[in-house]
UniProtKB/Swiss-Prot annotation:
Subcellular location as annotated: Cytoplasm
Taxonomic placement: Bacteria, Pseudomonadati, Campylobacterota, Epsilonproteobacteria, Nautiliales
Gene3D superfamilies: Aldolase class I
Enzyme category, top tier: transferase
Protein residues bound to 3-amino-2-oxopropyl phosphate: 6, 17, 214, 235-236
One Pfam family recorded for the sequence: PdxJ
The name this protein goes by in its record: Pyridoxine 5'-phosphate synthase
Length: 265
């Protein structure tokens, strides 16, 4: 199973002081040596972390394929088409959100998404759609001309954190998930089942399947063991771990956990 390392959070740290350090470009050889298969970046409309200068240099200098997350805004699609990353992953975007909150509305935004895909593919860029694990949405994805879907694991990750970490006892507790352990365990089983079923259906529909969002060293094993998922994109937890262990070791450890889980299924 492939690991895409999202390096946005290196730029988040830089932007906290609005200077040029740390530079995300310096992560590229370290991430590669540690065993990652892909670099992932998100060029947001508000440029809150990765900016156009970063994106251009990362795509130019990365010897690993670059997966560029972006919205379906026509101006952004034009920029991505010019930059020519290996892949573009289309994601929903709201300016006020802290991080991407849900999957693309592929059914409601079908025409706009199809237009974006057509433009990107004309520039020889593979396209993935970041979606909730929903069968109807996957059926629509298969018709858009996309090559891949990335299943949104955020709901699974949130339930897992409320069940197996101290999140519920902190200021970041998720109010909608302040439930009994039994209820959380039931919800977790459903979330895992939804992801497994979505991965199976997407693969049968001829789509490649990735997954990501909220994955960390504790919760990644279950997802990495799913047979139809071929790639995981993980960022914040790796960059957070790198503060303590260094970036090389943080990436290496994540890759090791993923590989071990993959051998178990």
């Amino acid at each position: 199973m492939k690991l895409g390392v999202n390096i946005d959070h290196i730029a988040v740290l830089r932007e906290a002081r609005k200077i040029n350090d740390p530079d995300p470009i310096e992560a590229l050889p370290i991430v590669k040596r540690a065993g990652a298969d892909q670099i992932t970046i998100h060029l947001r409309e508000d440029r809150r972390h990765i900016n156009d200068f970063d994106a251009k240099r990362i795509i130019e200098y990365s010897s690993l394929p670059v997966n560029m997350e972006c919205s379906i805004d026509p101006d952004i699609i034009d920029i991505v088409a010019q930059l020519k990353p290996h892949r573009a992953t289309l994601v929903p975007e709201k300016r006020e959100e802290v991080t991407t909150e849900g999957g693309l509305d592929v059914i409601g935004q079908y025409e706009r998404i199809s237009d974006a895909i057509e433009k990107l593919k004309a520039n020889e860029i593979d396209v993935s759609l970041f979606i909730d694990p929903d069968i109807e949405i996957i059926a629509a994805c298969a018709d858009t001309g996309a090559d891949m879907v990335e299943l949104h694991t955020g709901e699974y990750a949130n339930i897992y954190a409320m069940l197996y970490s101290n999140l519920s006892k902190t200021p970041h507790s998720i109010k909608s998930l302040e439930l009994s352990r039994k209820e959380l365990q039931e919800k977790l089983s459903i979330a895992i089942g939804d992801l497994e079923n979505a991965a199976i259906y997407a693969a049968k529909s001829g789509l490649l399947v990735a997954a990501g969002h909220g994955l960390n060293y504790q919760n990644v094993g279950t997802i990495a063991a799913m047979a139809n998922i071929i790639e995981l994109n993980i960022g914040q937890s790796i960059i957070a771990r790198s503060i303590w262990d260094g970036l090389f070791e943080a990436v290496r450890k994540m890759k090791e956990i993923i590989d071990e889980a993959g051998h178990c299924h």
